Amino acid sequence: MNDLERLKELCPPPPGHTPPTVNWHDTEQALGHPLPDDYKHLVETYGPGHFVQFLSLYQPKCPYHALDLERQTRDVNAQLTRHQEVSQQPLPHPPRELQPVGGTDNGDYLFWLKNDPEQPNGWTIAVTGLKDGDWSHFDGNLTAFLVALSQHDTDVSAFPDSLLRQSPSFTPYTTAPEEIEKANRHSNTATAAPVQSQDVRQWARENGYDVPERGRIPADVRKAYDAAHN
């Protein structure tokens, strides 16, 4: 059984779920490099959605701005550049070797490590909260990483311990236009100053909320933070 078949067992796509069709040639032309075959199969199998109620993959031409691969490549790369300019802690990898591929509810990022830009099937995975400086490396492709995460077989320092108690699952995002528009309004507001989990935690404590140093930020706390800053 290959990794994709195992992932479909652990996190089955909903019955009748049909992801959007992708023009891979145009996507790769826009990014300037080829993409891994396993990622293409993931996108064609799942489309936009949530793995283990925590992690989402960026998608080509995604109607959700926060998940659009090209848009997030630009935005996250800009964050990497700013981080290099102001941080006392250097990045463990040059930005040119990091291709954003996903994010989490807590503001963590998933990257491909492009050790050879022309051989994408050999790319491995790096995960970071960026602001806290913690980086984790997974020596396998994206699908294998999702399998390991779903089986609790990999340790990612940026991820909350509560994820180990989370059942494997995949939940597709709604295609309702009004929900997409609402999400994009919030995404566009946040683009200029991307929210980091430590900023939310600090604000929450200053305003009387009880939040752990690590772990999933409660939904009511995140909503209160967003309401106070938008």
What do these predicted regions represent?
Residues R165-R185:
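Charge-dense, low-complexity intrinsically disordered regions
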Residues L113-P117, T128:
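Low-complexity, glycine/alanine/valine/leucine- and proline-rich hydrophobic stretches
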Residues E213-N230:
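Short, Lys/Arg-enriched alpha-helical microdomains
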